[in-house]
Design a protein with these regions (language model features):
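Residue at a beta-strand N-cap/secondary-structure junction
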Residues: 48, 74-77
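Alpha-solenoid HEAT/Armadillo repeat architecture
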Residues: 30, 70-73
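Short alpha-helical DNA-recognition segment
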Residues: 47-67
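Long, contiguous binding/interaction regions
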Residues: 59, 96-97
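DNA major-groove recognition helix of helix-turn-helix/homeodomain DNA-binding modules
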Residues: 77-94
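N-terminal flexible/basic segments that precede or flank functional cores
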Residues: 1-43
């Protein structure tokens, strides 16, 4: 197995822990790069069972979820909220410090 595949497998395994996933998503948000956050969200979604399982939880269709999590994804707030809720998280606002 290549180093990058081994790293990805370890990352996905660690993101099965909700605290690890929370820290990972927050770190991605702090980078102020929406594309990076979508990559992080894709990884957490994969760790939590993938798009098929999330489609059932979010009541969104698979195609919409795949599109939302793609490299060109631009999720609507309502869809993002539904996805985060299905993953066990919520949207929050904090003061910029």
């Amino acid at each position: 197995m290549s180093k990058s595949k081994a790293y990805h497998a370890e990352l996905i395994e660690s993101l099965r822990d909700s605290h690890e996933a929370e820290e990972y998503l927050n770190a991605a948000l702090e980078e102020d790069n929406p594309d990076l956050f979508l990559v992080a969200l894709r990884n957490v979604a994969e760790a939590q069972g993938g798009v098929a399982q999330l489609a059932d939880k979010t009541k969104l269709n698979r195609e919409s979820l795949y599109k939302m999590l793609s490299e060109r994804g631009n999720p609507e707030l309502k869809s993002l909220d539904a996805l985060l809720h299905a993953l066990g998280f919520r949207l929050a606002v904090a003061a910029n410090r």
